[in-house]
């Protein structure tokens, strides 16, 4: 009997939490660029009783993503795909961020869109930064949504992006657009695709950002939010479980903002939770 396959791309804090929440009774295919972290995570989950297969991947290379999608299909019915892999401004240059966070998402949507099982669902982990990006004109948004993945990084306006922070927010806005555009193709396979935009989450990447140059601003945003706290990987795993599950059967091509109210406070000038 064919097993259902959960694919988790990116095994950082959120990826691990999602794998634990969703993986019981499924074959779990873990993928990451960092083979040392990938191996340690796979071994840890196996020790907890999960059925785990590990595969290295470079999400910025189509051949690598295609091979991962093919591997997933060989393991069983690909019913759940979660893409968490990404780089942040403190970790990489603008060019690297665009290659991983923009092109990587586009490649995952295309390659897994051809193997996802009917009734399956996918979630792309984006960021609240996508809501804070500098405005794009309609032509730029159409280009980010519909340009073939292999041509994305050649868009002329992307050549002007030299700041990691700008590249990150633009890539995350593009994630929303690519998910919207991909929802039709996924729907024709009887599957759904959505994204989640976390706020500041207590993961290794999140803590790196808090320790970086923008940490003070990030803490200020948290203080003025409704929740008044950092998010946890479990918060994101819970939102992911909803979007992968039957209660969201009529939800596709949309983004779920899970930021504790940061964007709402920024847009409305709301007083802090502690006020």
Outline where the language-model segments fall.
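A conserved structural motif in NAD(P)-dependent oxidoreductases
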Residues: 225-236, 247
